[in-house]
Regions:
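Nucleotide-activated chemistry modules centered on ATP-dependent adenylation/adenylyltransferase
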Residues: 1-192
Length: 192
C-alpha cells in the first residue's frame, strides 16, 4: 500500500511526476486541506487532478481536521477562536501536525486497504516530498520514522538526487505549469 502526502507545491508535484516516470505504484494521494491555502494552490489541485487522471494515477483525496463532534475546523477558525497566530509564529509546528499530518493519519486509520496491510503485519509506505537539498528535514524526521510501527517513510526525491531545480524541470517536462508556493495565506513563515 503506497500513499502520497500531496501538499500542492513544487516538491510534492515533482514527486508525483517522478513516481509516474519511475513506474512506482501509487494507491492513495492525500491532500490535507487546512482551509487556508493560497488560492493558487486550490486552483492547482484541479490542474494536477487532470494530469493524474490522464496518467492513470489515483485521484487526489482531500482530508481535513475535524473536531470530536465531527465538524470541520479550519486553521483560520482555530486562530480566530483562540485569538492567536498559528503556532509556527511561536516556533512550533503544531498547525502542520494538527491540520496536515493528523487528518491524513485519521483517514488512513479508517481506510480499508491500510487496515488490511496493518492486519497482515505490513507497513504502509508513505512517500514524502523532500528534495535533495533538504537533508536537515530528513535528519530531523529520521528518529520518528525509525520508531514508526505503521508507516515506512520513503523520500524519493532524495533517493533520485532531485534538487529544487530538478523538481522544477520535471514538472515542466511533464507539461505542467509550476504550482507556486503552497502555504496558508496567513502563515508567518511564508516566503515570497
Amino acid at each position: 500500500m503506497n500513499v502520497v502526502g500531496y501538499g500542492g507545491g513544487t516538491d510534492s508535484t515533482a514527486m508525483l511526476v517522478g513516481l509516474w516516470r519511475h513506474h512506482v505504484p501509487v494507491d492513495l494521494i492525500l491532500f490535507a486541506d487546512p482551509g487556508a491555502e493560497q488560492p493558487h494552490t486550490y486552483a492547482y489541485l484541479d490542474t494536477m487532478s487532470r494530469w493524474l487522471e490522464n496518467h492513470g494515477m489515483p485521484a487526489i483525496t482531500r482530508v481535513w481536521y475535524t473536531e470530536k463532534n465531527g465538524q470541520r475546523l479550519t486553521l483560520e477558525q482555530e486562530c480566530l477562536r483562540s485569538g492567536t497566530l498559528p503556532s509556527i509564529a511561536y516556533g512550533y509546528k503544531k498547525c502542520s501536525l494538527k491540520h496536515k499530518v493528523a487528518p491524513q493519519e485519521k483517514f488512513c486509520r479508517h481506510y480499508q486497504p491500510c487496515i488490511d496491510a496493518w492486519e497482515k503485519g505490513e507497513k504502509v509506505v508513505k512517500f514524502i516530498g523532500y528534495d535533495a537539498g533538504e537533508e536537515r528535514r530528513l535528519l530531523n524526521a529520521l528518529p520518528h520514522d525509525l520508531q514508526d510501527k505503521k508507516y515506512q517513510k520513503e523520500y524519493p526525491l532524495m533517493e533520485w538526487g532531485w534538487s529544487r531545480k530538478d523538481c522544477i524541470q520535471a514538472i515542466r517536462d511533464a507539461g505542467l505549469p509550476l504550482p507556486g508556493k503552497s502555504s496558508c495565506f496567513f502563515c508567518p513563515s511564508m516566503k515570497r
